[in-house]
Amino acid sequence: MMMARKQDVRIPTYNISVVGLSGTEKEKGQCGIGKSCLCNRFVRPSADEFHLDHTSVLSTSDFGGRVVNNDHFLYWGEVSRSLEDCVECKMHIVEQTEFIDDQTFQPHRSTALQPYIKRAAATKLASAEKLMYFCTDQLGLEQDFEQKQMPDGKLLVDGFLLGIDVSRGMNRNFDDQLKFVSNLYNQLAKTKKPIVVVLTKCDEGVERYIRDAHTFALSKKNLQVVETSARSNVNVDLAFSTLVQLIDKSRGKTKIIPYFEALKQQSQQIATAKDKYEWLVSRIVKNHNENWPSVSRKMQASPEYQDYVYLEGTQKAKKLFLQHIHRLKHEHIERRRKLYLAALPLAFEALIPNLDEVDHLSCIKAKKLLETKPEFLKWFVVLEETPWDATSHIDNMENERIPFDLMDTVPAEQLYETHLEKLRNERKRAEMRRAFKENLETSPFITPGKPWEEARSFIMNEDFYQWLEESVYMDIYGKHQKQIIDRAKEEFQELLLEYSELFYELELDAKPSKEKMGVIQDVLGEEQRFKALQKLQAERDALILKHIHFVYHPTKETCPSCPACVDAKIEHLISSRFIRPSDRNQKNSLSDLNIDRINLVILGKDGLARELANEIRALCTNDDKYVIDGKMYELSLRPIEGNVRLPVNSFQTPTFQPHGCLCLYNSKESLSYVVESIEKSRESTLGRRDNHLVHLPLTLILVNKRGDTSGETLHSLIQQGQQIASKLQCVFLDPASAGIGYGRNINEKQISQVLKGLLDSKRNLNLVSSTASIKDLADVDLRIVMCLMCGDPFSADDVLSPVLQSQTCKSSHCGSSNSVLLELPIGLHKKRIELSVLSYHSSFSIRKSRLVHGYIVFYSAKRKASLAMLRAFLCEVQDIIPIQLVALTDGAIDVLDNDLSREQLTEGEEIAQEIDGRFTSIPCSQPQHKLELFHPFFKDVVEKKNIIEATHMYDNVAEACSTTEEVFNSPRAGSPLCNSNLQDSEEDVEPPSYHLFREDATLPSLSKDHSKFSMELEGNDGLSFIMSNFESKLNNKVPPPVKPKPPVHFDITKDLSYLDQGHREGQRKSMSSSPWMPQDGFDPSDYAEPMDAVVKPRNEEENIYSVPHDSTQGKIITIRNINKAQSNGSGNGSDSEMDTSSLERGRKVSAVSKPVLYRTRCTRLGRFASYRTSFSVGSDDELGPIRKKEEDQASQGYKGDNAVIPYETDEDPRRRNILRSLRRNTKKPKPKPRPSITKATWESNYFGVPLTTVVTPEKPIPIFIERCIEYIEATGLSTEGIYRVSGNKSEMESLQRQFDQDHNLDLAEKDFTVNTVAGAMKSFFSELPDPLVPYSMQIDLVEAHKINDREQKLHALKEVLKKFPKENHEVFKYVISHLNKVSHNNKVNLMTSENLSICFWPTLMRPDFSSMDALTATRSYQTIIELFIQQCPFFFYNRPISEPPGAAPGSPSAMAPTVPFLTSTPATSQPSPPQSPPPTPQSPMQPLLSSQLQAEHTL
C-alpha cells in the first residue's frame, strides 16, 4: 500500500491553461481561434471523440449548469501521457474562454468580473463541483455523459499555452489578434509561468500570418512556437509536451518538429492504417450485398479496424466499406455483362443462322426478328424494369438468359455486326471449300495416292489461300484421297473378280511363283483400274495377295464381300425358316460342327504330348477357354503317347471327334513313332464310314528345348521332319523357322495360328462335309447345288423365296445350314431333292469331292465379275452334269438400254448352248419366279442321274485305292484350300452286303522310291524302313480280290440309250465324243495280283465300275468300257497295258464316251487355259527342271483341248500327283529357313554351316565371299544385269564343290562366268542356317524405317546396325560396300542400288511368308537394303548423309524409294548407254521371293 502510494506520488501532475483570443464576435470574429479543438484533440485524440464545433454562445441555464458552472473556463479533464524519456505524467487541462449570452450577446456575468486578459492570467482556479467538459451537446444533458469533477474544485496553473490562429478568419484582423495576444502575453509573463505559443489551424494557415507569429515570438525572450492542426491531429501532443518540459526543468528539451514534416508522418501513418483496413475489408467482404452493421461487428476486434477508426473515425471506415461494396457490385455486373455478351453470339447462331434472313437488317430490326423466333425465350429474358444492371436480375444466378434490353447497348450492336461478318465469311469459305472440292473431282491430275506436295500446284490459286488455311485444304484433300482410294480399291477388287478365271487357272497358292505373278502383270497391266493404284503399290500388292489368299483359302471371312457373304445370308435365311428340334440333340453327337469348340489331338512319345498339353492349358483361362481374334473358344486337348490301335490311345472316341493333330518329335525314334501312329490311324478308318481321319489336318513340330539351332543332329532332324511333312502333306514348324519355342518358351502366337487353321478347316467342312453318299440315295433322289455370286446387285431373298415359301420345302435331314429338301413331281413320280445353296467360292471345293447331280448357276447380267466367276466355275465341271444358267436382270427396258447387260445375256445364252445346258433370265423387278421354271432342268438331271452316280462312284473307287492322296484337295479338283481338310463326302463306296477293301492286305513296295528315300534319311535304317513301308502302302492301297454276288450285266448302250439322243428333237448331248479311258492308269509292273480285280482285261468287254442300283435287292449294275482307247504312249509302256489296248483297237466306237470338262466343249470357257501348260501345280518351292521334264513327258502325245489337262485322259489325277510328289520329294526338300545344302553325292562342311564357323577374329570375312567379290570387282562390274541374271546351276554347284575341297581355289583359272560366281555367292548366304541380317534385328529395322524424317530414320537404322553380332556386322559391311561399288557402275551394268536391293534383300533377310503381314511388309525390307547401299559411307565409314541419285533433297523419292509391284520398269529410271539393250525387266514378284527362291537359282 505504501509502495503504491509512493509510486502515485511520483507521477507528476501538471495543470495547463490554454488561452487565446476570446470575446464577442466583434473581438474574435465569427469563429474562435481553435482553443477548444486543441484541447479536445489532446484530451480525447480518437477521431470519433473529436468535435469541430464548440460554441461559446450559451443560454443562461447552460451557463449556470455544472459543466460551465457560471465560470468563463472549461475543465477538459485529466490526461496521462508518456513523455520522450518514457516517464509518465498527468495533466489537467483548462481552457480560458468567454461565454456569450444568447440573449444579449454580451459576456455572461460571473463571479469574476475581470476582463479576459486578467482572468486568463489567473494561476489559481476554483469552481466547486465543476464537471469535465466533452462537447456542446453535453450542456443540458450532463447525465448522458461521464460526470467527472475538477479535483478538489480548484487548480493551480503551472503553465500556459498561448494560441494564435494563423488561418484566414472571418471578420477578424490578424494584426488586431496579434495585438491582443501581445497584451495577453504581457499579462501572462507577470505570472512567471512557462508559456508556449501554439499556432492553430496550420492546415489552413496563411504563410504571412505564420511568419508574423514567429516574429512575435522571436521578439520575446525564450518563447517557443509549435505549429499545430487539431483537425489533422498534427503536433498537438508536441505543444503540451513542450510546455511540460518548460515546467519541469529536469526534463530534456523537446525537439520541435515543423508542421509539414509532422503532417507527412501523420499522413503516412493514416495511409498505412487505411491500406491495412482496406485489406481487412476485401478479405472479409466478398459479396456486394453485405451491410455495414454486420461487417463492422465482424471487424470490431481486428487491430486494422481499430487503428483506422482511431485515426480517421467510424464514418470514414464506413465510407471505405461502401466504396468496396460498390466496387464489388460493379465487378459483378461486369462479369454478368461479359457472360451475356459471350452468350450473345451463340444466341445469334442459334436463332438467326441464315445469312439470307438477316443480311440487310439493322440491329433494331434484327431485335424485332429475334422476338419472333420460337426459341427466343430460351436465350433471352424480358425484364419489367430496366436497365438490367439496376434490377435484382443481376443476383439471379440460376437464370443465365440474356436481358433483352442489353441488345440496346453498343457492344451488342457490335457483336451483331460481327455475327453478320462471320456468316458472310463462312459463306465465302464454304464456297471456297466447294470450289476446291470441285477442282479435286474434276482435275485429271488428282489420282489415288498422289501426295499433296505434287497436287498442290495443280489445284491451288490465290483465292484459296486468301480464305482458308492450307491445313484446311490438306484435310479436304486427305478426305478426297481416302474416297478415291477406297473407290479405286473397290474397283480394283472388282477387276480381280472379273479375272477369276485367270486366278483359278494359275492355281495360285500361299507363295505364288514369280512366273505366275508375271502372268498377272501381263493380263492386268493394261487395265485402267490396275493403273489407278500405280502410286499405291503397297496397297495394290496387299489387295492382290489378299485376293490370292481368298482364291487359295475361300471362307466367309476371306470373302471380298464379307460380312455380306452369300453363305452367311443363306445360313440366316434357312435357319430363320426352319426351327430344328434336333439341334439340341445334335450338340452331343459326333457330327456336331460347332466351331466354338476345338478338339485337338497332341501326338508325341516320351512325355512330349503331355508337356505341350500342359503348356497350352497354361495359356487358357481357368475353364479351358482360349481367345482367338477376340473370341472365346472351348479347347479340348487329347495327348496321346502310346499305341494308337489301343482304345485308350485312339484319335477318336464316342465323345471326342478331333479337328486336328499336333505331331511332336525330338529324335528319330519319336519321329518314327509319329509316322507309325498316323499310318495306323489312317488304316483303321480307311474302309469305314467315318474315314475323316484320313484327311485330319496335321502339324509337325520339332521340339528343341535347348533352343540350339545349330549342329548336325538338329539339321538332320529338321531335314527328316520336312521330308515326313512333305509325305504327309502337313505343315512343318521347327525352332528356327518361325520362332517356335517349346517348354517354358512356347510361342503363343504360333499356337494361335495352328488353332486358326483348324477353325478355317472346320468352317469349310460346314459347307461340304454334310452330304451323304450314294448309299443314302434311298432318302434323297437328287442333289442339286445352286450357286450365287457374292456382292451381286440382287438379294438372296429374291432367289430363295420361291424355294423357302414352297409347301414342299423341308429342313435338310443332314443338318446342313445351307441345304433344304424339296419334294417335286418330276415325270410320273415325286422326287426328293436336296438343294444346297452356296456361294461360288464355296462351290469350287465340291465339284469333284461331292456327288452333285446338277448345278443351277446364277449371275447378274450387269456385273462382269458375276459371269466371270460362273465361267471359272464351269471350267472344272464334268460335262455329264446338267447345268441351268440363270441371268438376273433389272427388267426388259434395262436390257435394251444397257450394252453390258445385253452382251452378258448373249454370252450366257451362248455358253448354255455350247455346253447343252439350259438358260433363262429372270427380271428382279417382276414378281418372284416359280419353281416350275426349273422343271425342265430337273428332268434333265433325272435322266442323267445314273451315269452321274456311276462316274462319281468310279472316281471315288480310284480315290479310295490310294490313301496317299494329298490332304489338301488338288486345285484341279476344286479350289485349293490352305491347311483345310475337306473330307470326301461319300462315306461308303461298296454295296452294303460286302466290303470292298481288306484292311490287312499286304502289298509290295516300290523299290526305287524305297532306295531314294533311304539315301535321304542319311543311313537311318529304322526310320528309312518305316517311311519306305509307309510310302509303299500309301501308293498300293488297291482293293484285293473280292467275290461279289453275280452281277446283273446289261448293255449300257441299251439302258443308257437316252444319252445318245442329241440328234433328236433338239435334246442336248451330255457326253463328249472323245474316248473314255480309265482314270487310273494302273501299271501291272508296279502292282500285284489284286490289280486284276479292277483292271484285268476281259475277252469282250471290260467292267469299269459297279453301281448299287437297288440296294434293297442287292443288284449290282456293271458299267463296261466297250471301247477302251489306246494310251498313245502316255502310260508306262507295260505289256499288259499294250495288250489291253490292242484288244480294244478294232472295237466299235461307243455312244458312251468318257466325261470331260466343260472347258473342252465351250470356246467361251477356259480362255486362260494356255497358262496351265506353263506352270506346275504348287508354288516356287515345287518348281524344278526334273519335275518339269516329267510333266512334259507325261503330256506328250496329247493334242487339242485335252492337252492342257493330260491326266484327264491318262490316269487318276490324285494318284498321279501322289506318285509325282513322292518322286519329287526324293530330291532335296525346301525347308524354311533353309538349312545347309544336302546332296546325294556330296556333303559340304563349308556351305550351310553357321557363319561363326567360317570366320575368325583375324579373318572376319569368309574366304569364299572374299574370293567371289574380288573376282566380280576385277572382271564383272561392267556386266549387265550382274546379280539379276542367274548363273548356271550345275556350274554354281561345281564351284561350291571344288571350293569345299580346296579353299585356295583360283576362280580366274577355272574360267567360271561372272554370273556363276555371283550366284554362288548369293547361294552361300541363302544356305546359312540364319540370315545375315538376324531376325531379331529385322523388327527393329522395320520400326526404324517407319520414321518419316529422313535424317532421323538413317540415324535410327545406324543405331540398329550397331546391335548386329560382330561377325554379321563385318560381313554385312563388306557385302554392302561391294554392292555400293557395283551401283556406281549402274550406267554400264544397269544395276542401281534399287535393283541390287531387289535382288539381295530376300537373300540377306529371308523373311517369313506364312502371314499376310509378312507378305505386305516386303517393300520395307527392300527399301531398308536400298538405303544401306545408297548410304554405305554414312552407315559404315562415318561420312555425311548423301542425297540419293535422281531425287532432290526432301523429295518423296528421296525419302522412301519404291519398288513397283507388277510393273516392268524400276521406279528410279537410269539412262541406258547408247546402243545397249534395255534393262532386263524386273520380276514382278521379286519382293515376295523367299529364301527358298534364292536357293533355287543356286541349285
UniProtKB/Swiss-Prot annotation:
MF (Gene Ontology):
DNA binding; GTP binding; GTPase activating protein binding; GTPase activator activity; GTPase activity; phospholipid binding; protein-containing complex binding
- Name the principal localization, coarsely classed: cytoplasm
* Ligand binding (GTP): 28, 33-37, 52, 56, 95-97, 201-203, 229-231
Q: Where is the Rho-GAP domain?
A: 1249-1436
List every stretch annotated Disordered.
Answer: 1124-1148, 1177-1207, 1446-1499
Record remark: domains: N-terminal part (1-266) has GTPase activity. Required for proper cellular localization. Mutation of this region is a severely defective loss of function. Mutants have defective morphogenesis of neural retinal tissue, agenesis of the corpus callosum due to defectuous midline fusion of the cerebral hemispheres. Mutants show defects in axon guidance and fasciculation.
Record note on quaternary structure: Interacts with the general transcription factor GTF2I, the interaction sequesters GTF2I in the cytoplasm. Interacts with RASA1.
Q: What is this protein called?
A: Rho GTPase-activating protein 35
Q: Which organism is it from?
A: Mus musculus
Encoding gene per record: Arhgap35
